[in-house]
Amino acid sequence: MFLLPRFILVSCIIGSLGFDNPPTNVVSHLNGDWFLFGDSRSDCNHVVNTNPRNYSYMDLNPALCDSGKISSKAGNSIFRSFHFTDFYNYTGEGQQIIFYEGVNFTPYHAFKCTTSGSNDIWMQNKGLFYTQVYKNMAVYRSLTFVNVPYVYNGSAQSTALCKSGSLVLNNPAYIAREANFGDYYYKVEADFYLSGCDEYIVPLCIFNGKFLSNTKYYDDSQYYFNKDTGVIYGLNSTETITTGFDFNCHYLVLPSGNYLAISNELLLTVPTKAICLNKRKDFTPVQVVHSRWNNARQSDNMTAVACQPPYCYFRNSTTNYVGVYDINHGDAGFTSILSGLLYDSPCFSQQGVFRYNNVSSVWPLYPYGRCPTAADINTPDVPICVYDPLPLILLGILLGVAVIIIVVLLLYFMVENGTRL
């Protein structure tokens, strides 16, 4: 009976030998209520249509292809679909949201609105866009695209002013100048409508600089007016530069309603597409995997800039992307990161995903889920099951009392026996 506490302690020490619970560099999920947004590296349909069907093209394990939890499109991204004619209707829903896309709009594509524009501005736009997407998908279950209907009472049509290579901007739309206007010093309006979603992410953009047309310089000025609430959202050009500027966008989160787009100078812009956010949920951080090229192409870090705790966990490989299918598809490091989608995990943190919820040598930063208690389990003389000192102290006291009782009893019986002899 008195050996039981000692037996428990010895069993605890033996059971803890060699155990560790470090954070792992993967994306995972607490349960089956998750969803992934991606590109060709997780586009199972694209692989099915290749000949032969070579799944080494993907970083995603093909066992997940029939899960119904993936919305991916080769050659595309959510940002690219949001702004340009090259469109894919990303649609998905889950408590735990994972993003592995963005590489299809990088400095490698060198997009800018005009020949004297700036791709740096578009990288800034990308970062601001994904910031809004990640923040809002931490509190919404559902993401999809919706068209935004608008009514312009003039005779002018939308124009493809902003284009580069194969990319043509169509969100927001530019309304061309009316034929009876001699310059761009005029005010013009258009109605647009948001309905059917809890909230929407829409673009509000201006050329932030002196826009030259026919020897005249113009300052862009754009506003959205909510006719139901009276709230005004606006941007005015503040820069005096005449080259090296581009289309600066802010990404507004708006409620349903009737809106008026207003231009006080230069061309009127009006949103044509929106991210539709639906089904509020309890706060659940999103997970983002860095979407980048092999080093032979220039990538950016805008998804990393956008993904900040506590609303987002960022995962990245420590090595260059080197694919096995081709140089940009099928990298072992990123395949390892996505392998966490094959199983449930109890705890997520800034450092990584914890496979167990008992103890770890690393204290989870910005933890979410059922997370372990930190303890120094790298010290070989200290078992992980004694990370809390109070049970150890109590156990020591009990062992001491047991030893004293045993000694007293032995002395008592020895004396008793000696007396009888």
From Swiss-Prot:
Membrane topology of the entry: Single-pass type I membrane protein
Ranges for region Esterase domain 2: 267-379
InterPro entries: Capsid_hemagglutn, HEMA, Hemagglutn-estrase_core, Hemagglutn-estrase_hemagglutn
Signal as UniProt keyword: yes
GO BP field: fusion of virus membrane with host plasma membrane
Listed name of the protein: Hemagglutinin-esterase
Positions of region (Esterase domain 1): 7-127
Free-text description of this protein's post-translational modifications in UniProt: N-glycosylated in the host RER.
One Gene Ontology cellular component: viral envelope
Main location: virion
Gene: HE
Organism: Bovine coronavirus (strain F15) (BCoV)
Signal peptide: 1-16
Catalysed conversion reaction: N-acetyl-9-O-acetylneuraminate + H2O = N-acetylneuraminate + acetate + H(+); N-acetyl-4-O-acetylneuraminate + H2O = N-acetylneuraminate + acetate + H(+)
